[in-house]
Amino acid sequence: MTWLVVGLGNPGDQYAATRHNVGQMVIDELGKRHNVKFSTHKSRTSIAAFKLGFGVDAHSVILAKSLGYMNETGGPIKALAQFYSTDPSKIIVLHDELDIDFGAIRTKQGGGDNGHNGLKSMTSSFGTPDYFRIRLGIGRPMGQQDPADFVLKQFSQPEKKELPLFLDRGADVVESLIEKGLEVTQSRFNS
């Protein structure tokens, strides 16, 4: 069965480098790592495909980014999952997480949306929260800054210096989850 790896984010250049789009940044990192080009799919998504592993043990992987806004992600991703006959047990969603320090990554299956509109849309569209989540820590804003404004801002200069390593680790987590499973991935990468 095909794995569907989804990076949550918002479309457009004005959002591309924001904290809220860190999931899509990891998708782009995976695309570079596997030397694939993205194309537009009829489900209103941008996708790229590759094989992870070798021979009979290779996994088919579709990288996906919705072309709509974060809170509308579920519909296009569900259409894509139906197209590839992928059920939620083979879907990995990468998203920004305020409640985890910048650079830390945690992986789980299922759970609540913690107020994240992209996860709300996914769960509503699929009728289940039982997909995998790779929670990419962006930390909380300092002082009185509104979290909704914070996630739509670019990373700070010190964070930008660490971002390439963070995105590379995010890509490693995706590959580990597909090849090694949840428990091995959690024990190796959850921080």
Regions found by a protein language model. Name each.
Residues G112-N114:
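Short glycine/threonine-rich catalytic loop with a Thr-x-Gly-x-Asp
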